[in-house]
C-alpha cells in the first residue's frame, strides 16, 4: 500500500471514521483535523495487505507534541479509519516506528 493513495483519499475527503475510531479520538482529545494532519504528514510503518475486508496499514505521525498511530483500511472506493492511539514506549522503538520483540 502506498501512502500517496491514502493521502489522496484524505485530500478528496473520501474517508470514513469508524465509531470505534471516533471513540478513541474523543478519549484522547484528537480532532478530525489532527487525524487528517497525522495522515497527510505521517508515514506507513506496517502494512497489512491481506487484511479483510480491505488492505490496511499502520501510520505514524505527530499530534500536537506526541507520537500518534492510526490504523487505516484502503477500500475500493474510500479510506476507512479503524483506530487511533498513543503508542506506548515499552511496546515501540525507533521513535515509535518499530515494535519491540
Q: What do these predicted ranges mean?
A:
Residues 1-101:
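Ribonuclease/tRNase effector modules and their secretory precursors
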